[in-house]
Regions:
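Short, well-ordered beta-strand micro-motif
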Residues: 69-71
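Long, contiguous binding/interaction regions
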Residues: 1-53, 61-65, 74-103, 107-177
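N-terminal short beta-loop-beta anion/metal-coordinating cradle
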Residues: 57
Length: 177
């Protein structure tokens, strides 16, 4: 008979698209209150100029992108719960039903990046409460590899540098356990 075991904790990241820095600061404060210290941040860049102005109407202006990782590792079975929590933060700052900040949590393990989403499609795995998990990138032969559905920003050298550094931090944490 197959035996089950607990999942190994993984590195929580949150991708953020925002326009208003006050809302960004407040949302990050809430995230830190829930998940603790941030141990790595990507460069800030214009999501609107480099990828898409899709969020600009909701955000109230040019969307800026940053990705954060949290020091404490987290059980990946909490992915749906964490996405619901980040959705509640988006709702807290929304105006007339429009998000003023977009928060996308995910997990880095030694071999992959998962992102949580509410968007249903054939390559996403249902978790619970309307939340899906997406394998966004996988690590093999010393590099990140994309899939046909990988978002363009996650394919970029800039974001992959951040992910590689975060993965290295995570691998160091695994040896401490």
């Amino acid at each position: 008979m197959a035996k089950t075991c607990e999942f190994e904790k993984e590195k929580l990241i949150v991708g953020v698209v925002y326009h208003d820095t006050d809302i960004y600061d407040s949302a990050i404060s809430i995230l830190k209150g829930e998940f603790g210290e941030i141990d790595n941040t990507s460069e800030v860049f214009s999501f609107s100029k480099e990828y898409s102005s899709y969020y600009d109407g909701e955000l109230g202006g040019e969307g800026m992108r940053i990705i954060l990782s949290f020091k404490e590792t987290v059980d990946p079975s909490r992915q749906a719960e964490i996405k619901l929590f980040t959705n509640s933060i988006e709702e807290k700052f929304s105006v007339d039903g429009k998000r003023r900040i977009n928060l996308d949590p995910g997990f880095i393990s030694h071999g992959r990046l998962l992102l949580a989403t509410t968007k249903k499609t054939g390559f996403r795995i249902p978790l619970s409460d309307g939340i899906y998990s997406e394998l966004t990138l996988f690590w093999a032969r010393g590099a990140w590899h994309k899939l046909p559905w990988t978002y363009r920003d996650y394919q970029s050298e800039r974001v992959q540098r951040f992910l590689t550094k975060t993965r290295k931090i995570y691998l160091g944490q695994r040896t401490e356990i």
